[in-house]
Each structure stands twice: as C-alpha cells, then as structure tokens.
Amino acid sequence: IDTIAECGKVCKHFHLPVQCGSDRILKLMNRGYTVADYMRLIHYAKEKIPDISFTSDIIVGFPGETEEDFAGTLALLKEVQFDSLFSFIYSRRIGTKAASMEDPVSSEEKSARFNRLIALEKEIGAARYQNFIGRTFRILVDGPGRSDPSCYSGRNDGYMIVDYDGKPEDIGKFITVKITKSLNWALFGERVSEE
C-alpha cells in the first residue's frame, strides 16, 4: 500500500477477496482473518491512496449462511463501496472441507440472496461512477470498445474501463479522456490529449 501511494507508475487498484462479511462464515471458510482485519486494511489503503479502487470476490450461500451472516456481507459492500465484484453462488466442491458440511441454505434462497447482492453492487457502482462525470483520466488504450466497436477502450489507473471516440493508432498509447457519462461498469468520455 505504501509503495503504491508513493509510486506514480503503479495502478491505484486492489483486488482483495473478502468472500463474505460474517466472521462466523469466514471462520468456517478457514480464511484466517476477520471482517475487522479486512476493514483495517481497506481504511489504511483509503487513507494513503484517496482515489483507490477496490474489487473483491463474494460467495453467497456458503453452508450454514444465515440471513444475519448475509446482512453482514451487504453491510460490508456499503462500507467499502467496491468498484465491482466477482460474485458467485456457493457450489459444493468434492475434496473441500465445505463439501462435507450440512447445507441448509436452499437453492432458491441462495439465488434470492445473490440477486440482492447484485442489485446492491449495481446501485453502489452507479453512484460511484456518476461521481466521475466531468473528471479527466489518463487511460491506457487496449483496443476497440467492448460495448460499442466504433469506440476505443482503455483503463484508468483504478482499472476502470473507459470508452471514447478513438482511432486504431491509439492502441497501446496513453490518452487523457474527460468523462462525459457513465453506464453500469463503464465510463464514456472524449479525448482531451495524447502523450
């Protein structure tokens, strides 16, 4: 964290898998940390690197997960304000400790919780990305736009996707882009300058 804060050549992005927001479930998962441990790291990183971007992994419906455990996960999402998540519904894997655990969480409940998690993630992401409208970012252009092939796309130092009206020769270059709109997990902008 300190190195990233001091070095201008490293992206201000961390992927820190938390898995869930319940100490009880984290212990069952044998994760070796608590929610408080995780949050200390998040707060330290935010203090040292104000524009830092976080992504994480979340598992919904781990064996024995209660509504209270799941509520802890939702509370964690609200506090951290992740830029995006890699979310999964728990599925039994042969050979793991969890495979032999009783799983009282029904498939329907797992799906319902997963949908609530995704809805909250979208709400948080939409609000965060709206705050970037009007700001300028230096992006590294990596190719045609993902949602619109007539655009070009790159990532800023927070690992966020930015689409803009570009040209083929921009690929591999740094371009400064002013953000004009946001949509789910993508930002759209216009070219300001080229390095």
Predicted regions and their residues:
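Conserved non-cysteine loop/helix-boundary elements of the Radical SAM core domain that shape
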Residues: I1-S84, G95-E109
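Generic beta-strand/beta-sheet core signal
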Residues: P17-Q19, T55-D57, F88-Y90, D142, ...
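AMP-binding (ANL) adenylation modules
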Residues: S91-I94, Q130
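Terminal RNA-binding accessory module
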Residues: S100-E195
